[in-house]
């Protein structure tokens, strides 16, 4: 079914930089699935979250809705078909892969129709989850592109 892309890890088993985050978000454009991306925040802020707990999902919604200041996209809505996972770690040596794996397993169990494309982490010791301004900018670009495409007259398919 779904799996973590091993190319997202560096030699130390730690997820790569924000460049990878950018590419992961842009998968919405590549797959032409705007507004169908689920990003579930698998975070550690000094507390141990039970990833199978509804409270974990609820808290993640509140936290990231406030930070992104846009419609939440990190939990399943009607029509969601794909997932991107974000996580962070404040401690060197924290098993950040297991942190995301737990959330992936929960999502696969609760929402089997969701196709998990990427699991993305910022480097260890990064204070912020990711560059939220960057993410908001990319979402805005995607939304603008989708709006522009919606205003174009339908082009006939050629050779298909």
UniProtKB/Swiss-Prot annotation:
The protein's name: Vegetative-specific protein V4
Native source organism of the sequence: Dictyostelium discoideum (Social amoeba)
Function, in words: Unknown. Its expression during growth is not required for growth but for the proper initiation of development, therefore playing a role in the transition from growth to development.
Record-level GO BP terms: aggregation involved in sorocarp development; positive regulation of gene expression
Residue ranges of Sequence repeats: 151-153, 154-156, 157-159
Keywords of the record: Developmental protein, Growth regulation, Repeat
Region annotation (3 X 3 AA tandem repeats of N-Q-[PG]) ranges: 151-159
Record keyword Repeat present: yes
Disulfide pairings: none
């Amino acid at each position: 079914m779904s799996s973590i892309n091993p190319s997202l890890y560096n030699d130390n088993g730690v997820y790569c930089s924000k460049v990878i985050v950018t590419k992961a978000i842009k998968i919405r454009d590549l797959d032409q699935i705007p507004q169908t991306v689920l990003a579930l925040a698998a975070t550690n802020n000094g507390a141990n979250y039970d990833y199978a707990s509804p409270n974990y999902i609820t808290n993640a919604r509140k936290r990231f809705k406030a930070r992104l200041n846009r419609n939440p996209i990190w939990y399943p809505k009607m029509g969601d078909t794909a997932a991107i996972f974000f996580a962070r770690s404040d401690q060197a040596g924290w098993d950040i892969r297991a942190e995301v794996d737990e959330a992936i397993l929960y999502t696969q169990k609760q929402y089997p129709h969701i196709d998990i494309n990427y699991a993305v982490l910022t480097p260890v010791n990064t204070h912020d989850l990711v560059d939220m301004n960057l993410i908001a900018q990319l979402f805005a670009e995607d939304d603008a592109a989708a709006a522009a495409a919606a205003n174009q007259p339908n082009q006939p398919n050629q050779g298909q």
